């Protein structure tokens, strides 16, 4: 061998030395610091210290398991070998003629010293992270050093006619080879050095991406452990089995950083600024990958060109083999870059952007003004305006569940815009080089004709997407409201009507989806036809100009066109995602720009109102329906009890909300003491001495907000447990006795919004939360409404004014003024939005205002202190105070079993998605024939694409002569049989068939997509209906125990996947499967050996995919499950927003959301990690197949250039087709998880809808007969009614009393057949209701619950949801419940005599102009929140009156109204029900409510302990009812009511 010397060679080596010196500076500095004793580790302070960084802390076990010793010793050994070889070569160069190599060899010797110095540095550096960073330098040092001996060996070939060369062989050559080998091994060893021990955060290991070596990181090898664990522990996998996210990937850190950079920037600009490093890497890598993607085409051109030359010079294959090697290296490099690009954009962009936006939406929601108290103005009857959507809590959930996902998806794919442009430019340059500018211009002209159509359809598609989002919001919002009010709907037997309404919204949504899909189909046609027609036109013009078409030109051009086609074919999805992202970002922007709740506190000592006009946020002062409090001038005494009273709807709750800063101050000012922030409170350091913070606020809402947690967790509300205070709180709030009846005491899980508690218990838990809190200011909204007399007095004396209530500022809204009057310090009387009177009790009494209120109580013939119920017998007989309360369960956990969970955990299947799921999806829409047609379309499309390439092979293999014979190699079998096909045809003949095939492929390609879309929409339509029906008809027990977030997850996220992804993924999978089939067919046509190789690689791919799918399925299921808590937390927090903010806990709930989003992100992160693990290995396998195909083509001399072009054009697609095909299958399996979850709900157990149809007029009378009734909530639970027997004759009014847990509410459920009899019977109107059809039964009865349920819409839509009654019937019902006065009805177009003639001066004072109930078109906001609690109860009562049932059940239905209104309502109820063959059952706490009834049913332990007339029960010597009356404190008053009745 000979080496040519020159100045350029010496300069190159000198530059290399400088690079090596730069690479070695790190090791030199490390050794120098170590020698001078100044070496300090960044993370480890000593050998015994545990490693810690921002991600987490290492454990002793992980520290012991971590080691990089063998890597360092191997590096030292290889460095020594290199040094020995370099030293030997240096000595040899001292002997002529090798002395001419003195400079390069001595430079190599110098480099060997640097390598040795690096090896020493690995032992001198104590920090593992620093050693890892040093390994990066060492890798480049080794890699660059190798280039020198490689260059010497490569240039050692002796060029003919040159004189300046030397002989290089023998020892010198072998020493160079040894150095190259040692350098390669050293580079590999550097890649194997781990970075750090595994670190832990919150008790869980952190993701190991940055714990392992560079090799592990770039090959995703750190996923192996989790993959194997998932495969072996499918049934035990949960979110806690997954590693924690790194610090930079945790939601709190991401959101904090995002908010810092956002400022006043637009959201798009903020995302760019926050993620510019990742975006820059994305764009650079994508551009690099774009350039690399054309490398195989260049190599293909080189191979085909060399094969064409092989005919003239047989045996000259050197250049061909060089192109084969180049092809293999380019494919491998491209595979690695592509895999890393997709990992980067998902892990560093898609997931973080989703986390940031979800957190931002929630954090903003926690700061937004609560506008749900203000109704939207409908655009017309039944219309839903945009304002209503903005005020919907469900719309906010959609922003995080759907819109944030769409924006993050676009962040994942946006780089394809840049790469598409780059591919277009590079493709154009290559095509100009291959076929000339005229041919390319012809193709571009044909493609340009579609641009106007493309622009028009794109605009239409964008509009359709906006319509689709709006339609989805409307459907989801309605569904959310229905689920919240499902109990009322089931009681009213209106499941079908509401299902029809939801189905109507769903149909409108699917119509828009179909319109968007049609537009998208046109775009698909354009994007398929453009590259196909581009290639057809370009090659046709080229052939016409040149008269021939060579294989190298044709197939290379075709390969470029295929790349262009692949790029352009992704544009429909890219444009779809881009347009969706723009629409979604606009929606998020609108939410972010919504007004926020401002700071309302200042440095004052007491709460002051100075001539303030107050209204709910979002309202307008001039709108009649927007209630306004005017001229409020108040000063609440510190540490005193202030009582706010007034009639129903006078603004009492609005006044409380204004203290909390939840209202808009139109004029004047409100001053509230400033409370310390959570960080300033130091709750963990609280002691009894400093427990109360005078300026902190606690709030008890009119609708108590209860978390889906245990009783204790609801009371503590995040505060530390203080045993004595906790027990005192339970006693003061009257909860001690209730907890003793719960199966798990205060560890009882009480379900979403306290569904497992009675109304009174929910109120007392909410009050206990306020009592236990550290707040010095307690703001309470009528805590006595749902309490019986004794419990109310107990709470008043021991809670409100007891030890825990004293020395705190207490502001209370109540209708029970008489109860609170003795200890009231400040009294406020409201009337029609103004201050009727204010001052001390004495001042207000002297002015007569308080006397008026007390007179109303007198008129109502009731007073809380005169009331009693059976609930209190045990209190009276044995209450011993807080000291007698048992230690809470948490204090002795070992003595208890694990508490039962009321809410059920979401189920998760394991293993592969069953074929039954796929079959069910396909069969649901009754469009099986369309699926078959689509499948045939994919097969035909592939056949056309193979046929097009085959025809091109025939064309390029034909002789130039017009009538010449053409020999074509149709197949290459084992017997090497060659079949000659004799063809004659002109150039136009070839062109005509080629263009015809191209056009046919465009039509079939579009048709298959359209068939898939139609079939998918049909399946989605039916699946939605199939899941909606059982959910609406599920037993109440299931609806109560399944979190609403889990149900909504099915109807939002899962349905979104079904609507938008499953059909597309099926289409993509079919495309890739047919592509692979086409490639295999092409391989068979050339050589069976290629088929064998392809099958081997496919088996390897299937093995890898089986490992991947075993883990990916479970992770995807976990991801779906992890989303439900996010949605549940959204809904729960928005429901309790006022309570959360009043307690100053908004930031706490934001942190809770961070944790839930992180758990979801962990599943998404690992799902994509598994995807990349598979993708890298698949693309490497594809690169091997393509390279082997090229080698076989070059090796076999009998294969012509045209046949080689044919097979290579498909082989180049194998890499992409296999990897994307398996990725599509994985995505389909993960998307089908949504189908699996939806199908799970289609098989829910539903209530039996069968049964006999009663006569049309049934019940003609309201007689109820209960015989020995035994019912329970579940077969495994004990009975709640045990042998209950009683009879209600028609026309009777029956009161039901009993302590909590006596079975009163269970009786109501049994009457409606929500609880099926285990024994006994219930006869209504002479028929056994157990044998009746449920709808027929429930539609003939009516119940008014304690918690009223209203739906957003209008007054009419709530009174008469399905337009079955006239306006006057509705107005009459409103008049009967005294929401309208007689004078109001006179202003109506027509007037009918009201059923009740009860009017009073109080009624006549209502101003018709300010009464929203005077118009049936008056808007009702979501949940009826623009009405007071009392107004909502009255509206529900009016709704029941409209239905005119024969049997009416009231469950303390007027607990939230003032006493006089209650008296008026009770009088109306008595006039409407319990007369004229109808019956009335009232479950009541106020004894005066039922004291004059015909019968009293006293219940205890599920039995009727007494049943008879009030007089009979009162005269029973030892009866329960008599005990109630005697212990009431006002025995004479109750006796007067009872005896006057007779």
From Swiss-Prot:
Domain ABC transporter as annotated: residue spans: 609-857, 1264-1526
Domain of life: Eukaryota
Coiled coil regions, renumbered to chain: none
Segments of this protein annotated with the region Disordered: 881-905
Principal location listed in the UniProt entry: membrane
Binding site for ATP 1: 646-653
Keywords: ATP-binding, Glycoprotein, Membrane, Nucleotide-binding, Repeat, Transmembrane, Transmembrane helix, Transport
Pfam families xrefs: ABC_membrane, ABC_tran
Subcellular location: Membrane
GO cellular component labels: membrane
Membrane-crossing residue ranges in chain numbering: 5-25, 74-94, 103-123, 134-154, 173-193, 284-304, 325-345, 417-437, 522-542, 544-564, 927-947, 987-1007, 1062-1084, 1089-1111, 1173-1195, 1200-1222
Membrane disposition: Multi-pass membrane protein
CDD domains: ABC_6TM_VMR1_D1_like, ABC_6TM_VMR1_D2_like, ABCC_MRP_domain1, ABCC_MRP_domain2
Function field: ABC-type transporter; part of the cluster that mediates the biosynthesis of a highly modified cyclo-arginine-tryptophan dipeptide (cRW).
Name of the protein this chain belongs to: ABC-type transporter avaQ
């Amino acid at each position: 061998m000979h080496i040519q010397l020159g100045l350029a060679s010496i300069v190159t080596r000198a530059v290399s030395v400088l690079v090596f010196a730069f690479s070695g500076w790190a090791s030199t500095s490390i050794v120098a610091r170590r020698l001078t004793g100044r070496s300090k580790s960044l993370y480890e302070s000593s050998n015994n210290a545990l490693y810690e960084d921002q991600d987490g802390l290492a454990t002793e076990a992980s520290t012991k398991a971590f080691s990089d010793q063998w890597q360092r010793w191997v590096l030292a050994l290889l460095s020594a070998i290199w040094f020995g070889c370099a030293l030997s070569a240096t000595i040899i160069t001292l002997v002529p003629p090798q002395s001419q190599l003195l400079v390069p060899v001595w430079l190599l010797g110098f480099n060997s010293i640097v390598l040795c110095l690096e090896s020493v540095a690995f032992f001198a550096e104590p920090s593992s992270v620093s050693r890892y960073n040093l390994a990066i330098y060492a890798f480049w040092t080794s890699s660059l050093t190798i280039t020198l001996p490689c260059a010497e060996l490569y240039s050692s070939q002796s060029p003919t006619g040159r004189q300046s060369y030397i002989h290089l062989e023998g020892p010198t050559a072998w020493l160079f080879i040894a150095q190259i080998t040692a350098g390669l091994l050293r580079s590999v060893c550097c890649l194997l050095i781990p970075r750090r021990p595994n670190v832990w955060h919150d008790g869980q290991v952190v993701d190991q991406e940055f714990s392992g070596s560079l090799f592990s990181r770039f090959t995703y090898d750190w996923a192996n452990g989790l993959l194997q664990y998932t495969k072996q522990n499918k049934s035990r996998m949960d979110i806690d089995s997954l590693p924690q996210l790194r610090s930079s990937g945790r939601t709190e850190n991401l959101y904090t950083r995002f908010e810092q950079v956002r400022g006043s920037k637009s959201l798009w600009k903020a995302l760019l600024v926050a993620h510019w490093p990742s975006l820059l890497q994305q764009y650079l890598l994508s551009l690099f990958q774009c350039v690399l993607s054309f490398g195989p085409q260049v190599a293909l051109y080189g191979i085909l060109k060399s094969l064409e030359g092989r005919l003239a010079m047989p045996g000259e294959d050197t250049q061909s083999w060089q192109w084969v090697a180049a092809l293999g290296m380019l494919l491998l490099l491209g595979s690695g870059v592509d895999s890393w690009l997709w990992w980067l954009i998902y892990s560093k962009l898609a997931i973080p952007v989703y986390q940031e936006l979800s957190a931002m939406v929630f954090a903003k929601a926690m700061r937004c003004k609560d506008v749900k108290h203000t109704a939207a103005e409908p655009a017309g009857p039944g219309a839903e305006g945009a304002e209503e959507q903005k005020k919907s809590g469900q719309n906010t959930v959609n922003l995080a569940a759907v819109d944030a996902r769409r924006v993050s998806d676009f962040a994942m794919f946006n780089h394809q815009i840049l790469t598409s442009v780059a591919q277009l430019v590079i493709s154009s340059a290559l095509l100009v080089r291959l076929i000339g500018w005229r041919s390319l211009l012809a193709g571009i002209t044909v493609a340009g004709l579609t641009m106007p159509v493309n622009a028009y359809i794109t605009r239409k598609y964008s509009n359709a997407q906006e319509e689709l989002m709006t339609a989805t919001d409307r459907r989801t919002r309605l569904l959310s409201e229905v689920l919240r009010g499902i109990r009322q709907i089931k009681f009213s037997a209106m499941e079908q009507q509401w299902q029809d309404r939801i189905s109507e919204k769903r149909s409108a949504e699917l119509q828009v989806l179909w319109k968007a899909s049609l537009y998208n189909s046109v775009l698909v046609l354009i994007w398929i036809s453009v590259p196909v027609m581009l290639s057809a036109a370009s090659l046709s013009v080229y052939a016409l100009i040149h008269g021939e078409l060579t294989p190298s030109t044709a197939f290379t051009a075709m390969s470029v066109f295929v790349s262009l086609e692949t790029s352009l074919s992704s544009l429909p999805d890219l444009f779809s995602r881009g347009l969706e992202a723009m629409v979604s970002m606009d929606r998020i922007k609108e939410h972010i720009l919504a007004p926020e709740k401002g700071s309302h506190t200042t440095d004052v000592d007491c709460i002051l109102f100075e001539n303030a006009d107050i209204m709910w946020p979002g309202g307008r002062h001039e709108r009649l329906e927007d209630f306004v409090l005017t001229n409020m001038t108040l000063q609440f005494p510190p540490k005193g009890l202030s009582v706010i009273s007034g009639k129903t709807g006078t603004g009492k709750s609005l006044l409380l909300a204004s203290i909390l800063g939840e209202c808009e101050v139109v004029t004047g000012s409100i001053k509230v003491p400033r409370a310390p922030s959570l960080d300033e409170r130091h709750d963990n350091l609280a002691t009894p001495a400093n427990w109360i913070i005078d300026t902190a606020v606690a709030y008890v809402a009119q609708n108590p907000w209860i978390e889906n947690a245990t009783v204790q967790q609801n009371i503590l509300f995040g505060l530390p447990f203080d045993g004595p205070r906790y027990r005192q709180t339970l006693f003061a709030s009257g909860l001690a006795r209730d907890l003793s009846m719960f199966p798990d005491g205060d560890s009882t899980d009480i379900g979403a919004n306290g569904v497992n508690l009675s109304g009174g218990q929910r109120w007392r838990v909410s009050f206990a939360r306020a009592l236990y809190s550290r707040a010095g200011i307690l703001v309470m909204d009528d805590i006595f409404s749902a309490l019986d007399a004794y419990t109310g007095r107990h709470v008043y004396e021991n809670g409100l004014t007891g030890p825990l209530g004293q020395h705190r500022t207490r502001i209370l809204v109540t209708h029970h003024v008489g109860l609170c009057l003795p200890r009231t310090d400040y009294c406020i009387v409201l009337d029609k939005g103004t201050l009727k009177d204010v001052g001390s009790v004495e001042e207000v009494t002297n002015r007569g205002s308080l006397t008026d209120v007390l007179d109303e109580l007198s008129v109502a013939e009731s007073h809380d202190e005169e009331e009693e119920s059976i609930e209190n017998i045990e209190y009276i007989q044995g209450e011993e105070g807080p000291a007698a309360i048992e230690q809470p369960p948490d204090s002795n956990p070992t003595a208890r079993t694990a508490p039962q969970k009321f809410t059920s955990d979401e189920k998760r299947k394991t293993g592969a998605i069953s074929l039954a799921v796929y079959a069910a999806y396909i069969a649901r829409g009754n469009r099986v024939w369309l699926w078959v047609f689509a499948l045939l379309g994919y097969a035909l499309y592939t056949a056309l694409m193979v046929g097009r390439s085959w025809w091109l092979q025939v064309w390029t293999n034909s002789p130039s002569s017009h009538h010449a014979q053409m020999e074509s190699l149709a197949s290459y079998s084992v017997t090497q049989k060659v079949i000659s096909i004799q063809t004659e045809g002109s150039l136009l003949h070839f062109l005509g068939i080629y263009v015809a095939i191209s056009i046919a492929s465009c039509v079939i390609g579009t048709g298959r997509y359209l068939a898939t879309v139609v079939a998918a929409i049909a399946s989605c339509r039916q699946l939605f209906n199939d899941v909606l029906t059982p959910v609406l008809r599920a037993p109440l027990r299931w609806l109560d125990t399944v979190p609403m977030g889990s149900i909504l997850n099915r109807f939002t996220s899962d349905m979104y996947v079904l609507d938008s992804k499953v059909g597309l993924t099926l289409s993509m999978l079919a495309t890739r499967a047919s592509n692979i089939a086409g490639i295999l067919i092409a391989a068979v046509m050339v050589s069976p050996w290629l088929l064998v190789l392809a099958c081997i690689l496919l088996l390897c791919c299937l093995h890898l995919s089986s490992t991947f799918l075993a883990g990916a399925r479970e992770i995807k299921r976990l991801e779906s499950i992890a989303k439900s808590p996010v949605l549940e937390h959204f809904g729960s927090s928005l429901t309790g927003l006022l309570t959360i903010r009043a307690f100053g806990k908004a930031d706490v709930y934001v942190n809770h959301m961070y944790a839930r989003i992180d758990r979801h992100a962990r599943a998404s992160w690992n799902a994509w990690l598994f995807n990349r693990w598979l993708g890298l290995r698949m693309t490497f396998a594809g690169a091997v197949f393509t390279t082997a195909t090229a080698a076989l083509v070059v090796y076999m001399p009998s294969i012509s250039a045209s046949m080689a072009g044919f097979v290579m054009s498909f082989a180049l697609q194998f890499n992409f087709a296999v990897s994307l095909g398996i990725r599509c299958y994985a995505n389909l399996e993960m998307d089908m998880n949504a189908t699996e979850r939806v199908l799970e709900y289609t098989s829910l157990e539903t209530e039996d809808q069968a049964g006999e149809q009663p006569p049309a007029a049934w019940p003609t009378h309201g007689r109820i007969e209960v015989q020995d009734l035994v019912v329970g909530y579940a077969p495994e639970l004990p009975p709640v009614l045990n042998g209950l027997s009683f009879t209600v004759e028609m026309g009777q009014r029956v009161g039901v009393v009993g302590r909590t847990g006596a079975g009163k509410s269970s009786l109501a459920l049994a009457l409606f057949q929500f609880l099926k009899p285990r024994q006994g019977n219930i006869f209504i109107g002479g028929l056994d209701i157990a044998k009746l059809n449920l709808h027929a039964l429930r539609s003939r009865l009516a119940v008014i619950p304690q918690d009223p349920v209203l739906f957003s819409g209008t007054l009419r839509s709530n009174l008469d949801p399905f337009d079955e009654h006239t306006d006057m019937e509705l107005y009459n019902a409103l008049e009967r419940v005294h929401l309208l006065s007689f004078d109001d009805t006179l202003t109506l177009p027509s007037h009918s005599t009201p059923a009740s003639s009860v009017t009073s001066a109080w009624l006549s004072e209502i101003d018709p102009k300010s009464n929203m109930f005077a118009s049936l078109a008056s808007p009702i906001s979501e949940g009826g929140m623009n009405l007071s609690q009392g107004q909502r109860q009255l509206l529900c009562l009016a709704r029941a009156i409209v239905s005119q049932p024969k049997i009416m059940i009231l469950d303390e239905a007027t607990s939230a109204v003032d006493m006089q209104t209650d008296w008026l309502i009770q009088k109306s109820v008595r006039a409407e029900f319990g007369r004229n063959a109808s019956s009335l059952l009232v479950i009541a706490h106020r004894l005066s409510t039922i004291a004059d009834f015909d019968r009293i049913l006293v219940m205890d332990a599920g039995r009727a302990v007494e049943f008879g007339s009030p007089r009979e029960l009162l005269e029973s010597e030892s009866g329960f009812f008599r005990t109630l009356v005697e212990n009431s404190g006002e025995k004479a008053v109750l006796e007067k009511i009872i005896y006057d009745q007779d």
